[in-house]
Amino acid sequence: MAALSIHHFRQAKQAGQPLVALTAADYATAQILDRAGIDLILVGDSLAMTSLGHSSTLPLTLEQMIHHAQAVRRGVERAFLVADLPFLSYQVCKEQALLSAGRLMKEAGVNGVKLEGGYPDMVETVAFLVQRGIPVLGHIGLTPQAKHQLGGYRQQGKTPSEAERLRQEALSLERAGAFALVLEHMPAELAAQITQQVGIPTLGIGAGPACDGQILVTHDLLGLSERIPPFAKAYANLREVIREAVEAFVGDVHQRLFPPT
């Protein structure tokens, strides 16, 4: 099974082949996703909420991200593996971003990193990393690390000025060398416009069907999350399946039916 390279993503866009991306934070999940044919596996900072029980992504540390990315790496053979840079592991200066990204590549073996935002300083940071051989996945629209500044998990790009800002951010990140862009929680029409104007692939999450691919949080996809965003879809209800299995085990033990005699 040949591992996917960074070239796969632009080739897929040119061929009109939709890309599929999901998140993973542990070995078993990563192995399942990889064998299912996922193009990109993201060790997302959403693990702060889905795996560690925090109310936002902000508490996640770089050390925790490295720990989870190492586990995911062991389960991935084919997919392109990207890790989020946690809050305050890259915003101080571009040199800090380089050290954080470098540690994730050296210690966890990821193929690239994801940074949130498309403002001028962040575009400069993206270019700085790319010039030093680090593939970067951009992320604009709703950027969860900025939830307080944005006033919560609200749709972005609804006004003409916001939409124009996001279009310009997408172009700037492409020029900086990002290999793809995550477009999160923005109007479908705006995401379609951005997808048409950039030469790199777009991965939508709550951004309509016209993006070059789609990305979801795996816990949402599998019905493991307590609350699923309105733009996501649960393809299973594993929360209920797991509960029923555990309750069946508890019942068997209480009735001395397990282990069998």
UniProtKB/Swiss-Prot annotation:
<dbReference type="GO" id="GO:0015940">
    <property type="term" value="P:pantothenate biosynthetic process"/>
</dbReference>
<keyword id="KW-0963">Cytoplasm</keyword>
<feature type="binding site">
    <location>
        <position position="114"/>
    </location>
    <ligand>
        <name>3-methyl-2-oxobutanoate</name>
    </ligand>
</feature>
<feature type="binding site">
    <location>
        <position position="116"/>
    </location>
    <ligand>
        <name>Mg(2+)</name>
    </ligand>
</feature>
<comment type="similarity">
    <text>Belongs to the PanB family.</text>
</comment>
<dbReference type="InterPro" id="IPR003700">
    <property type="entry name" value="Pantoate_hydroxy_MeTrfase"/>
</dbReference>
<protein>
    <recommendedName>
        <fullName>3-methyl-2-oxobutanoate hydroxymethyltransferase</fullName>
        <ecNumber>2.1.2.11</ecNumber>
    </recommendedName>
</protein>
<keyword id="KW-0808">Transferase</keyword>
<dbReference type="GO" id="GO:0005737">
    <property type="term" value="C:cytoplasm"/>
</dbReference>
<feature type="binding site">
    <location>
        <position position="84"/>
    </location>
    <ligand>
        <name>3-methyl-2-oxobutanoate</name>
    </ligand>
</feature>
<keyword id="KW-0460">Magnesium</keyword>
<comment type="subunit">
    <text>Homodecamer; pentamer of dimers.</text>
</comment>
<dbReference type="InterPro" id="IPR040442">
    <property type="entry name" value="Pyrv_kinase-like_dom_sf"/>
</dbReference>
<keyword id="KW-0566">Pantothenate biosynthesis</keyword>
<dbReference type="GO" id="GO:0003864">
    <property type="term" value="F:3-methyl-2-oxobutanoate hydroxymethyltransferase activity"/>
</dbReference>
<comment type="function">
    <text>Catalyzes the reversible reaction in which hydroxymethyl group from 5,10-methylenetetrahydrofolate is transferred onto alpha-ketoisovalerate to form ketopantoate.</text>
</comment>
<feature type="binding site">
    <location>
        <position position="84"/>
    </location>
    <ligand>
        <name>Mg(2+)</name>
    </ligand>
</feature>
<feature type="binding site">
    <location>
        <position position="45"/>
    </location>
    <ligand>
        <name>Mg(2+)</name>
    </ligand>
</feature>
<comment type="pathway">
    <text>Cofactor biosynthesis; (R)-pantothenate biosynthesis; (R)-pantoate from 3-methyl-2-oxobutanoate: step 1/2.</text>
</comment>
<feature type="binding site">
    <location>
        <begin position="45"/>
        <end position="46"/>
    </location>
    <ligand>
        <name>3-methyl-2-oxobutanoate</name>
    </ligand>
</feature>
<feature type="active site" description="Proton acceptor">
    <location>
        <position position="184"/>
    </location>
</feature>
<dbReference type="Pfam" id="PF02548">
    <property type="entry name" value="Pantoate_transf"/>
</dbReference>
<dbReference type="GO" id="GO:0000287">
    <property type="term" value="F:magnesium ion binding"/>
</dbReference>
<dbReference type="InterPro" id="IPR015813">
    <property type="entry name" value="Pyrv/PenolPyrv_kinase-like_dom"/>
</dbReference>
<keyword id="KW-0479">Metal-binding</keyword>
